[in-house]
Design a protein with these regions (language model features):
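Non-catalytic alpha-helical scaffolds and adjoining flexible linkers that form interface surfaces
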Residues: 1-21, 26-200
Length: 200
């Protein structure tokens, strides 16, 4: 049983028991952590405001025999501008949901925290958040080993989609905006990504 400090990002939370929250964190030192924040639902809780989804935080975790507890937490960055814009909020929460789905407890993915922060910043500034989210999702799927080699795969998919998927897999997320796709093509890419997510 021990306490450890780390930096991380809140991927989500849900209410449990009468006054507690179950918190999903991705941490720099320990990867994905699922922890209990005791009393977090109380109005007077010290956790109030710090457990919001996509808050970047410093956190003290207590690793017990059965449960991990959030002992202390401090918000370092909260992207307040997102919460004042419903469209940006919707898109960033989607990114948090994807990240939470694709990471497993105690699993570490290299540079995920930085990738997630870059994605949020791009969503705040781009006119095409959809392609940023596509690029981010493909990059995580690639990190966890779900993505095939698009240059060598034998498939019935049109080559233009394979080329696009390989581009957003290998290039910086901001470069995804440079590729022009029709609305129909973007929807087709979404369908492909959804199929890939089923294998994750």
């Amino acid at each position: 049983m021990r306490s450890k400090n780390t930096a991380g990002v809140v991927l989500g939370h849900k209410n449990i028991n009468e006054a507690d929250k179950l918190v999903f964190l991705y941490t720099e030192n320990f990867g994905k952590i699922i922890a209990i924040a005791k009393g977090a639902r109380k109005i007077t809780s010290k956790f109030t405001g710090h457990l919001e989804t996509l808050n970047f935080v410093k956190v003290e975790l207590y690793f017990g025999g059965k449960y991990t507890l959030v002992k202390e937490i401090e918000t370092i960055k909260n992207f307040k501008e997102i919460r004042d814009d419903l469209e940006k909020l919707k898109n960033t929460l989607k990114v948090a949901e994807i990240t939470n789905k694709l990471t497993y407890e105690n699993e570490q993915i290299p540079n995920l925290t930085q990738l997630l922060e870059n994605c949020i910043k791009l969503i705040c500034s781009t006119k095409r958040p959809h392609v940023v989210i596509q690029s981010y999702t493909i990059k995580i799927l690639n990190q966890i080993g779900v993505i095939p080699n698009f240059k060598e795969i034998e498939t019935a998919l049109d080559k233009k989609y394979l080329k696009y998927l390989n581009f957003i897999k290998t290039k910086p997320m901001e470069d995804a905006e440079k590729i022009c796709l029709s609305m129909e093509e973007e929807r087709n890419v979404d369908r492909i990504i959804q199929r890939l997510l089923q294998y994750a």
